[in-house]
A protein has these predicted regions:
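Secretory targeting signals
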Residues: 1-5, 19-21
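Exported/periplasmic ABC-transporter solute-binding proteins
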Residues: 29-66, 70-80, 87-90, 94-103, ...
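N-terminal export leaders
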Residues: 6-12
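Bacterial N-terminal signal peptides
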Residues: 13-24
């Protein structure tokens, strides 16, 4: 057997053990502390579960603030007091890293998001059968999306509508949420009859009884999501421990449960 093949096999056996040891070391330092996390609104349910798991493992309290990635980016440039930033667009963390605001070598692409058209179960048009045509139906007077000026999921929605060739036809129907969670709330509350929202929200307990149609990933730029530890993090050890936890198999399984994909899969499929 070739030496190269043996070395590769040994590497894949050793790597999980190395990560486990590294995570254990960070978690030991994190015990009993508190971290402040700025998270994109598409993570509302997934991050809630991850935070609870981490708290049980380490005793570290995770205080999460949800919002739009673009707004957090502006706040962090002006010294907002967060330890970690989980963005729905990796370009924001990259810019923070380039500006020297991030802890060196902590930038991590943790997931790739997906978008769907979502309607309440009682909607007059069945989105699972009609897809894009749902948005053109006269029963749909308002379509909720996140504000594309500062929300990555809003930009993805606009790009997909343009790719589908219906943006001009539905532009007058669009209503903007401050972030993707607020856009979803507009549809849930009846203030819009349909919405283009994050799959991670559509599969949550609050929305899973509605109907959804997954927008093909090739119809919009990939929602590459990135995280990092801030250079001025008050509890850096705990922040690093949380970031390492997110890389674990347990955390990735939780993200997958909420519809998130991972960079290695999308690259393999040529969707990058």
């Amino acid at each position: 057997m070739a030496v190269g093949k043996i070395n590769r096999r040994m590497w894949f056996r050793v790597l999980p053990l190395t990560l486990s040891v590294f995570l254990a070391q960070h978690e030991a330092l994190a015990k009993g502390k508190e971290i402040r996390l700025a998270a994109a609104a598409d993570l509302k349910f997934a991050m809630g579960e991850l935070s609870e798991m981490f708290e049980r493992r380490t005793g570290t309290k995770v205080n999460v603030t949800y919002g739009s990635s673009g707004n957090f980016f502006s706040q962090l440039q002006n010294g907002a007091p967060f330890d970690l930033f989980f963005s729905a667009d990796i370009e924001y963390p990259r810019k923070l890293e380039a500006a020297g605001i991030a802890e060196p070598e902590t930038l991590y692409e943790y997931a790739v998001g997906r978008i769907v058209i979502w309607t309440p179960a009682e909607a007059k048009v069945d989105v699972t059968k009609h897809g894009w045509e749902t948005l053109l139906d006269t029963s749909v007077e308002k379509i909720a999306i996140a504000n594309p000026e500062h929300a990555p999921y809003g930009r993805a929605a606009v790009a997909a509508l343009q790719k589908a060739g219906i943006y001009e036809s539905v532009q007058a129907k669009l209503v903007f949420g401050e972030n993707i969670a607020q856009a979803a709330q507009f549809v849930q509350s009846g203030n819009a009859q349909a919405g283009i929202v994050a799959l991670s929200l559509a599969v949550s307990p609050a929305m899973r009884d509605g109907k959804r149609w997954e927008i093909p990933a090739e119809m919009h730029p990939a929602l590459e999501q990135g995280a990092l530890v801030l250079k001025d993090a008050k509890n850096k050890d705990a922040a690093l421990a949380f970031l390492e936890f997110v890389k674990s198999a347990t955390a990735r399984a939780t993200l997958a449960k909420y519809g998130f994909e991972f960079p290695e899969k999308t690259k393999k499929e040529g969707r990058r």
